[in-house]
Swiss-Prot record:
One of its GO terms (molecular function) is copper ion binding. One of its GO terms (cellular component) is cytoplasm. It comes from Enterobacter sp. (strain 638). Keywords: Cytoplasm. The keyword Cytoplasm applies. This is PF03932 family protein CutC. The lineage of its organism: Bacteria, Pseudomonadati, Pseudomonadota, Gammaproteobacteria, Enterobacterales. It holds the Pfam family CutC. Disulfide bonds: none annotated.
Length: 247
């Protein structure tokens, strides 16, 4: 049966995802940045309240996946923190200046992970040569690759996803980006083993007083009075579709 991973941006969302049937959680902060390393407080809370596997993302900033020496040092410290808190896995991705998997740094990551399962995230979709990158990640012992098939959505990238899946059973190919109940059967019928979805929506902030005259964001157009969270019913619907196909 296909595994359903839900991307969560708070401890509360992680609890919701678990309650509605998620098999695993990718834990992040900052949805508008595409996911950054969660705070220690959030990580600790999730370890105390969630029993299904949780894999935190290790990503110090938004943007590209070529990191400075200082940023990489911070990532190694965060990996140590995640390990010490007892998480079974983590999510990250590193590329070099030429868009290839940064093998020297990834070797350091695999050592620092100390047996935690490593997911190489959608940095894979920004690499120069996906088939070569797949082989390199297999060589490293990466557990899985999260990918949209180098397209804007996994549905559009299904051709590459199925081709990579056919190469080898390891790393596992996990489809992500625009995966939802309405297109889930495409991936299930293609034999994709793991599915990644945010299953979320933006909801209005509960604040009654709103100072609309200024913004705390560098994006002046950003709506600071909305919050992103997991929609439990969406998780439940996807889980039911997966279970129905397993019968």
């Amino acid at each position: 049966m296909a595994l359903l991973e839900i991307c969560c941006y708070s401890a509360e969302c992680a609890v919701t995802a678990q309650q509605y049937g998620a098999d695993r959680i990718e834990l992040c902060a900052a949805p508008k940045e595409g996911g950054l390393t969660p705070s220690y407080g959030v990580l600790k809370s999730v370890r105390q309240t969630v029993t299904i596997p949780v894999h935190p993302i290790i990503r110090p900033r938004g943007g590209d996946f070529f990191y400075s020496a200082g940023e990489f040092d911070a990532m190694l410290e965060d990996i140590a923190m995640v390990h010490d808190l007892g998480f079974p896995g983590l999510v990250l991705g590193l590329l070099d200046e030429d868009g290839n998997v940064d093998m020297p740094r990834m070797r350091q990551v695999m050592t620092a992970a100390k047996g935690m399962a490593v997911t190489f995230h959608r940095a894979f979709d920004m690499c120069r040569n996906p088939r070569q990158a797949f082989d390199k990640l297999a060589e490293l012992g990466v557990a899985r690759i999260l990918t949209s098939g180098q397209e804007s959505s996994a549905e559009k990238g299904i051709k590459l996803i199925t081709e990579l899946k056919a190469q080898s059973g390891v790393p596992i190919i996990m489809a992500g980006a625009g995966v939802r109940a309405s297109n889930l059967e495409i991936f299930i019928n293609a034999g994709v083993e793991e599915l990644h979805s945010s299953a979320g929506k933006w909801t209005p902030s509960p604040m009654r007083y709103r100072n609309t005259g200024l913004s705390m964001s560098t994006d002046a157009e950003a709506d600071e009075y909305s919050r992103y969270g997991v929609e439990g019913e969406s998780v439940a619907v996807m889980k039911s579709i997966i279970e129905r196909h397993h019968v």
